[in-house]
Amino acid sequence: MSAKGAGGARGRGAEGEKIVATNRRARFDFTIEDSWEAGLVLTGSEVKSLREGNVNLSDAYALPRGDELFLVNCRIGEYKQAAHFGHEPLRDRKLLMNRPELDRVKGKIEQRGYTLVPLRLYFKQGWAKVELGLAKGRSHEDRRHAIAERETKREMDREISRRRR
C-alpha cells in the first residue's frame, strides 16, 4: 500500500526532511500528549521500499522489550527489484533512541491507558526516522465531538471566504 493509503501526504517537511508517510488515523483515534523522534533499524530493501513510499502506519505501535523499543505492525511493502534478497513486510523493527530518552518513554508507556503510536515516517539527512506520539485512547463521544468541531470550523471558513468575494 502506498503512503497515500496510509493516510499520509508525501513531500517535504522541515529543512532536510522528506516525509514518507503520516498516520492521520492516530490523531483521530487518540489524544497525543507528547512526541519523540527515533531512528529505525532497516535492511537495504526496506529503505528502497520506503523511498518509493510503500509503507502503511495505520495499525502500527511501539512496544518495549527488555531495554529496547520495537515498532510492531508497520507494513513496509516488498521492494520488487530485491527478488530473493527482500524482506518480510510485517517484521518488528528496532527503534533507536538515547538511553535517558528511552527510559523516560518506557516509564510513560507503563502507565495505564497509554500507548506509543507512530505519527509520521520520514528521511532526515538520509536517515529513516519515525515520530512517535504518546497516545491515550479517545472515547466515541470524544471522536464525535472532534468531528463536530472540525465541521463547525469548516463551515465558518466557508462562510468567511464566501463573504470576502
Curated annotation (Swiss-Prot):
HAMAP family named in the record: SmpB
Where primarily located? Answer: cytoplasm
**Source organism's superkingdom?**
Bacteria
Q: Per its UniProt record, what Pfam families does this chain match?
A: SmpB
User: Which GO terms label this protein's molecular function in UniProt?
Assistant: RNA binding
Relate the protein's function as given in its record.
Answer: Required for rescue of stalled ribosomes mediated by trans-translation. Binds to transfer-messenger RNA (tmRNA), required for stable association of tmRNA with ribosomes. tmRNA and SmpB together mimic tRNA shape, replacing the anticodon stem-loop with SmpB. tmRNA is encoded by the ssrA gene; the 2 termini fold to resemble tRNA(Ala) and it encodes a 'tag peptide', a short internal open reading frame. During trans-translation Ala-aminoacylated tmRNA acts like a tRNA, entering the A-site of stalled ribosomes, displacing the stalled mRNA.
- Per UniProt, which keywords does this protein have? Cytoplasm, RNA-binding
Q: Which family does it belong to?
A: Belongs to the SmpB family.
Return the protein name: SsrA-binding protein
Where in or outside the cell it occurs: the entry states: Cytoplasm
CC per GO annotation: cytosol
Question: Which GO biological process entries does UniProt record here?
Answer: trans-translation
- Annotated segments matching region Disordered: 141-165
